[in-house]
From Swiss-Prot:
One of its GO terms (biological process) is positive regulation of inositol phosphate biosynthetic process. The lineage of its organism: Eukaryota, Metazoa, Chordata, Craniata, Vertebrata. Residues 39-54, 114-133, 206-233, 296-341 are cytoplasmic. Present in almost all organs including spleen, small intestine, kidney, lung, liver and brain. It is found in: Cell membrane. Glycans are attached at N4, N169. It comes from Rattus norvegicus (Rat). It comes from the Eukaryota. This is Platelet-activating factor receptor. SUPFAM superfamilies: Family A G protein-coupled receptor-like. Receptor for platelet activating factor, a chemotactic phospholipid mediator that possesses potent inflammatory, smooth-muscle contractile and hypotensive activity. Seems to mediate its action via a G protein that activates a phosphatidylinositol-calcium second messenger system.
Length: 341
């Protein structure tokens, strides 16, 4: 157990868990989000992006910003929680973690509301000019969340603690709270409350979408595959929230209370759970691109064409290889072996 004038405990399994999970997420996330951004840049001229595509591009950028910090966290946990690079990079990594988490929540929220309007008020939504609104909302989200996260850049988020074997000191990153700090507790209560407010609004909008799609008269429905894609999109957004964001925010407040010393009975168990929810939280960078497949027709078509061309090229490659074999060795002939001396 770590004691440094606070109530901290340690979960040593994280020094193995985080490097593995973050390495996988980094590779998959950079490939997936980089590909998404390339597809958007290739298929959609910037002036033709509608509101929902603007939100999707911003969500991708937020994911990529966080992914760029993962190598720092991989090194940190590989060194058993010792921050060996510049202190400012600790502040920057924490800042981008906060920005990605709550930009993702915000953009998934406005994407859901956009789909809710399209289903609940289709005529009004079709007549609306939404590009300007998409740009405005995106700027508001970025500015408000970045301004809040700038606090992490202005303070020293590292602290020095002795090693367990007593052989020296190590530098922790974002692992120190002043005991019984009321301002920190208030901030965490506010953030957690805001998250669940947004989550319940998203849940309500998605339930309305599902109910409308399932109960709308057949004559008003489009092709069955369109309805099926819409339902899958709703389920995917809810899955991202339930898998990535909800567990972290359920554990966050009890964990904060334990870290501050208000409740220490189950501190170790809560801290263990907190490490797992941090891993789940980071998986949103990999799951977000899945949502795009259900939202844009061109994106799905592009993926289908690429997948089909890859399968065709493999078949052609195998066919060419077989043809070459038949040309080199016809079936009615046998190879001539060299004479032995």
């Amino acid at each position: 157990m770590e004691q440094n004038g606070s109530f901290r405990v340690d979960s040593e399994f994280r020094y193995t868990l985080f490097p593995i999970v973050y390495s996988v997420i980094f590779v998959l996330g950079v490939v997936a989000n980089g590909y998404v951004l390339w597809v958007f840049a290739t298929l959609y001229p910037s002036k033709k992006l509608n509101e929902i595509k603007i939100f999707m591009v911003n969500l991708t950028v937020a994911d990529l910003l966080f992914l760029m910090t993962l190598p720092l966290w991989i090194v940190y946990y590989s060194n058993e929680g010792d921050w060996i690079v510049h202190k400012f990079l600790c502040n920057l990594a924490g800042c981008l973690f906060f920005i990605n988490t709550y930009c993702s929540v915000a953009f998934l929220g406005v994407i859901t509301y956009n789909r809710y309007q399209a289903v609940a008020y289709p005529i009004k939504t079709a007549q609306a000019t939404t590009r300007k609104r998409g740009i405005t909302l995106s700027l508001v989200i970025w500015i408000s969340i970045a301004a809040t996260a700038s606090y992490f850049l202005a303070t020293d988020s590292t602290n020095v603690v002795p090693k367990k074997d007593g052989s020296g000191n190590i530098t922790r990153c974002f692992e120190h709270y002043e005991p019984y700090s009321v301002p920190i507790l208030v901030v965490h209560i506010f953030i957690t409350s805001c998250f669940f407010l947004v989550f319940f609004l998203i849940f309500y909008c998605n339930m309305v979408i599902i109910h409308t799609l399932l109960t709308r008269p057949v004559r008003q429905q489009r092709k069955p595959e369109v309805k099926r894609r819409a339902l899958w999109m709703v389920c995917t957004v809810l899955a991202v929230f339930v898998i990535c964001f909800v567990p972290h925010h359920v554990v966050q407040l009890p964990w904060t209370l334990a870290e501050l010393g208000y409740q220490t009975n189950f501190h170790q168990a809560i801290n263990d759970a907190h490490q797992i929810t941090l891993c789940l939280l980071s998986t949103n960078c990999v799951l977000d691109p899945v949502i795009y497949c259900f939202l844009t027709k061109k994106f799905r078509k592009h993926l289908s064409e690429k997948f089909y061309s890859m399968r065709s090229s493999r078949k052609c490659s195998r066919a060419t290889s077989d043809t070459c074999t038949e040309v080199m060795m016809p079936a009615n002939q046998t190879p001539v072996l060299p004479l032995k001396n």
